[in-house]
Regions:
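Membrane-anchoring alpha-helices and their flanking helix-loop junctions
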Residues: 1-91, 100-175
Length: 175
């Protein structure tokens, strides 16, 4: 029963994520500001923006490789498949990469579109994801996998989340 519910949930997640991406891309296109003349700043914005988008694709692909479908689709919310947490690949570089650096794509598109509205929406979406991490994901991980997850790793994650919030805020204010 739980497995069937999880499979149905995966379909819903894919639909929501797909429509979320499509809506965000349409929003970006609607707010894109083409430069009047192409200069060095424009080149830098495009190169950094495309680099952030490519980094995001790599980060999410590597996270899926490490996690697999079970963890990618929050399988342990539905049924317990006793496994230890895996800290490999991107997880060795960034704690919770889906929440900390997983929004590089949004910021990259914000730079490419040269739109303050896109940057602000990207920032707000990122902050909502970090709130989900703090209030849903982390308590769930501690409940399922125990307090061995706590300690140094949690302190590092808290610092990274705070730095991610500060970096996002800085990008939003500066742009």
């Amino acid at each position: 029963m739980e497995f069937n519910a999880w499979v149905a949930y995966r379909v819903i997640v894919d639909l929501v994520l797909g429509t979320d991406l499509a809506a965000y891309l349409v929003f970006c296109l609607a707010h894109m500001e083409a430069p009047e003349s192409f200069g060095l700043l424009d080149l830098v914005l495009y190169v950094v923006g495309v680099s952030l988008c490519l980094f995001n694709i790599w980060a999410k692909s590597d996270a899926h490789r490490v996690l697999g479908d079970y963890a990618w689709y929050w399988g342990d919310f539905f049924f317990l498949f006793k496994k230890d947490l895996t800290f490999d690949g991107i997880f060795q570089m960034f704690p919770h990469p889906m929440y900390t650096v997983g929004y590089a794509f949004y910021y990259g598109l914000g730079l490419i579109t040269r739109s303050k509205q896109v940057i602000v929406v990207s920032f707000c979406a990122h902050m909502l994801q970090l709130l989900f991490l703090v209030f849903v994901e982390n308590p769930h991980i501690e409940k399922i996998y125990g307090t061995a997850f706590s300690g140094e790793k949690e302190q590092l994650e808290t610092k990274m989340v705070e730095k991610g919030m500060l970096l996002s805020l800085f990008v939003c204010i500066e742009y």
